[in-house]
Amino acid sequence: MTRTVMCRKYKEQLEGLERPPYPGAKGQDIFEHVSAKAWADWQKHQTLLINEKRLNMMNAEDRKFLQGEMDKYFSGEEYAQAEGYVPPAE
């Protein structure tokens, strides 16, 4: 049976993650309150931010920025966008 969670991002019961994506309390919070769909959507957005803003994951400030944006993304606050990005036509 599939595990479901009340998704913090989409405000509905959705399929949950199979395991916490991070170690510790932060990972457990995401596991318990973020759906697999919201996590996949965040990973796509995170990739856009890393590429378009040229973030370096070896840089502590860039990692801190991305962590803050993830918190905003899941809590429904306004979060950073990749300026000038135009999604490909389907």
Curated annotation (Swiss-Prot):
The biological processes this protein is annotated with in GO are: cellular response to oxidative stress
Which Gene3D superfamilies does the entry mention?
A: Fe(II) trafficking protein YggX (1.10.3880.10)
One cellular component GO annotation, for this chain's record?
A: cytosol
Q: Which UniProt keywords apply?
A: Iron
> Do you know which PANTHER family this protein is assigned to?
FE(2+)-TRAFFICKING PROTEIN-RELATED
Which NCBIfam families does the record cross-reference, listed alphabetically?
PRK05408.1
- Family (UniProt): Belongs to the Fe(2+)-trafficking protein family.
Task: List the HAMAP family hit by this protein, alphabetically.
Answer: Fe_traffic_YggX
Name recorded for this polypeptide: Probable Fe(2+)-trafficking protein
